[in-house]
Amino acid sequence: MSRIAQTFERLASQGRTALMPFLTIGYPERDSALSLAQALVAGGADMLELGMPFSDPLADGATIQRTTDIALTNGVDIGFCLETVRQLRATGMSIPLLLMGYFNPMFQYGVERFVAEAKAAGADGFIVPDLPPEEADEFHAAAKAHELDLVFLLAPTSTDARIAKIASLSSGFIYCVALRGVTGARAALADDLGDFLARVRQYSQLPRAVGFGISKPEHVAAVAKMAEGAICASALLDYIGNLPAEERATGAQQFVQSLRDAADRATGYQQ
């Protein structure tokens, strides 16, 4: 059983929802992910998504595009992202780490090489928003060979046939996009989110993690009652980016702690 599956299983036994914050590697400073990741874990993160910057992030809104541009200016590439994972593991970090990025840089690097080096570095899986299942054979085979999870995305507009296809290929969990459109903080979640998650459940028993637009404790509380995981990205990055450098780690920890507390209150978990 993968570390991701073990984490979801443990949380399910406790009646808890997985909290999965996102960091762009190389933002705000080149090495910021090392201290920020530690802070997020201290705040209650169960898994981390580590964003690999790419010059044309099609699925991402203004915040992640901006953080990506800064990371690229800071000289971040695939090799640096893999080294970041290695360094996090060297600190003793044991929670699942997922690399999230676009397919083109991975293809240029070499899919088998990338997956093998990610495994050696200590990664647990991948999220590749622009990799459709019809074109994922090589990546899927490499991930399976190295016992890493490959997570696919579903949107509220996905047909039943698409949901069934993703359910047959995804491992670890299914990334359920909460809203139509690109990433970014929103004021409210979609009214039909529960219906969408119920449709996904008809085709898969994998955990469902909800992302895109999750920006505040109230959102996480709502998701915790419907799904097995909640992903927060843009709102966290905006918050970190507005803090003085010396306050970022503490601020990140407090931000995530507020989400953790909201999720646990929603599910009735008490330590």
From Swiss-Prot:
Reaction equations catalysed: (1S,2R)-1-C-(indol-3-yl)glycerol 3-phosphate + L-serine = D-glyceraldehyde 3-phosphate + L-tryptophan + H2O
Record's keyword annotation contains Lyase: yes
Pfam families in the cross-refs: Trp_syntA
Organism domain of life: Bacteria
CDD domains: Tryptophan_synthase_alpha
Active-site feature positions: 49 (proton acceptor), 60 (proton acceptor)
InterPro entries: Aldolase_TIM (IPR013785), RibuloseP-bd_barrel (IPR011060), Trp_synthase_alpha_AS (IPR018204), Trp_synthase_suA (IPR002028)
EC number(s) stated in the UniProt entry for this protein: 4.2.1.20
Gene Ontology cellular component annotations, sorted alphabetically: cytosol
Record pathway: Amino-acid biosynthesis; L-tryptophan biosynthesis; L-tryptophan from chorismate: step 5/5
Keywords tagged on the record: Amino-acid biosynthesis, Aromatic amino acid biosynthesis, Lyase, Tryptophan biosynthesis
Enzyme class: lyase
Gene Ontology MF terms: tryptophan synthase activity
Matches recorded under NCBIfam families: trpA
Family recorded in the similarity comment: Belongs to the TrpA family.
Function: The alpha subunit is responsible for the aldol cleavage of indoleglycerol phosphate to indole and glyceraldehyde 3-phosphate.
Assembly notes: Tetramer of two alpha and two beta chains.
Protein's UniProt name: Tryptophan synthase alpha chain
UniProt source species: Herpetosiphon aurantiacus (strain ATCC 23779 / DSM 785 / 114-95)
